[in-house]
């Protein structure tokens, strides 16, 4: 079957004859949208002709946007395409839908639960939403590449690499901007689970579960022997991470270089080497996050993680000491290379990050490592956001709702930030 574009107009049920108050009719008209939001089988064509803000399940998703990526609208105002095949390629597949999405704004949905084993990475063009709500959709062995694309939303998907090849679950690169990654479940990639790099900016990553992987996330990536060669290109990066769950990982939760980063209300739990890492004049506000680890816990790593260098590595032996290491010391990840190259390249920039830490919670054997350093250079978010004080109850909520879970997650009632209305 071919991918098909939804063209059925939104149907508002007529009031039954003899029903004077219209209450039952008004209730019934919203059932398709409500079923979709809460994991039911309703499809877009049952409630909306096109993905615009009059469509209840479209507007419900867009209301969850926060942070630097909040301007992303994906396929809003375009057309629906429904994926009907679970094959890697051919008619009705997700790959075919993404090829069609190059023609204009597209909101992609799925006709049924699907497990799609990929032969190679999928490329996501500009003005695209991939929306797995209401279905259980899993991409296996490879993931999604967002390269030079603008205005992209990825929500409610599982991506499992099974450690089968050196690739990423989500790679945002090459000047991409206005990207929102929401409610994904990402695991077992031999390279990284998520990158934001190479001049990409205005990205929000929210309510996503990162687990069972080694090198989890890079926010910018130094690819030159001259550490600051691409500083002007990459320092424009602005990334928000909130309400994400990093569980049973090894390191880089995340690792940030250059750029402006806001991390709030994330849960890091059971890392095997270290939690976060910042260096090379990254500017980061780290607030309201929860760090939890147990020095005596059992390691759940595979026998080894494959690496780009071809080295087989395992980090289980580090757990007793790593449990305390909620982060590497400021700049530690790049200090050695910086000192070796400083004279040759005449570095005047700092190898440390500019940090402001606020209201973070450390549980179990986890200990604070990072401290304020030139905090006046750290960002003051220009937007309004749903901030919650870090508590054990918040940790439980993140464990429950982060990942490819059913339905949307309501924003916290409490708001913070300079962008809030007076």
Where do the language-model regions lie?
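Structural detector of coil-to-beta-strand junctions
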Residues: 143-145, 169-171, 193, 216-218, ...
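Long, contiguous C-terminal flanking segments immediately downstream of a protein's structured core
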Residues: 47, 51-72, 76-79, 98-100, ...
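Extracellular beta-strand-rich solenoid/capping regions of secreted or surface-exposed proteins
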Residues: 95-103, 115-129, 137-155, 161-176
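Acidic glycine-/aspartate-rich tracts in secreted/extracellular proteins
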Residues: 87-88, 112-115, 135-136
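Sec-dependent signal peptide recognition
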Residues: 25-33
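Right-handed parallel beta-helix
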Residues: 127, 132-135, 150-161, 176-190, ...
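N-terminal secretory signal peptides that target proteins for export/translocation
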Residues: 1-25
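N-terminal signal peptide c-region/cleavage motif recognized by signal peptidases
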Residues: 39-40
């Amino acid at each position: 079957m071919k991918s098909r574009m939804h063209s059925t107009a939104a149907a508002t049920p007529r009031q039954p004859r003899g029903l004077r108050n219209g209450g039952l009719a008004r209730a019934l008209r919203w059932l398709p949208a409500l079923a979709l939001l809460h994991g039911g089988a309703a499809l877009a064509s049952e409630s909306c002709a096109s993905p615009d803000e009059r469509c209840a399940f479209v507007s419900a998703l867009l209301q969850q946007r926060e942070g630097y990526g909040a301007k992303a609208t994906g396929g809003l105002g375009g057309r629906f395409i429904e994926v009907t095949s679970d094959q890697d390629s051919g008619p009705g597949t997700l790959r075919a839908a993404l090829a069609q999405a190059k023609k204009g704004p597209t909101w992609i949905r799925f006709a049924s639960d699907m497990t799609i084993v990929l032969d190679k990475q999928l490329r996501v063009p500009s003005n695209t939403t991939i929306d797995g709500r209401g279905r259980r959709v899993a991409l296996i062995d490879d993931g999604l590449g967002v390269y030079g694309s603008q205005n992209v939303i990825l929500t409610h998907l599982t991506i499992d690499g099974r450690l089968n090849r050196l690739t990423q679950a989500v790679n945002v690169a090459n000047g991409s901007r206005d990207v929102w990654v929401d409610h994904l479940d990402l695991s077992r990639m031999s390279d990284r689970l998520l990158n934001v790099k190479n001049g990409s900016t205005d990205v929000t990553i929210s309510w996503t579960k990162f687990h069972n992987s080694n090198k989890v996330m890079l926010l910018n990536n130094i690819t030159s022997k001259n550490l600051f060669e691409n500083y002007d290109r990459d320092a424009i990066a602005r990334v928000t991470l909130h309400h994400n769950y990093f569980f049973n990982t090894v390191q880089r939760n995340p690792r940030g270089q250059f750029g402006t980063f806001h991390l709030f209300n994330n849960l890091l739990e059971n890392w095997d080497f270290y939690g976060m890492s910042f260096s090379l004049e990254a500017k980061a506000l780290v607030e309201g996050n929860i760090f939890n680890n147990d020095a005596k816990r059992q390691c759940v790593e595979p026998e080894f993680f494959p690496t780009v260098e071809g080295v087989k590595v395992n980090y289980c032996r580090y757990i007793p000491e790593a449990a305390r290491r909620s982060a590497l010391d400021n700049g530690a990840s790049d200090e050695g290379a910086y000192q070796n190259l400083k004279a040759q390249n005449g570095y005047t920039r700092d190898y440390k990050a500019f940090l402001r830490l606020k209201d973070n919670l450390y549980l179990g054997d986890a200990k604070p490592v990072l401290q304020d350093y030139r905090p006046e250079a750290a960002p003051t978010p220009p937007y309004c956001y749903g901030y919650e004080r870090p508590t054990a109850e918040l940790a439980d909520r993140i464990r429950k709702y982060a990942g490819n879970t059913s339905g949307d997650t309501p924003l916290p009632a409490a708001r913070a930030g300079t962008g809030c209305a007076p």
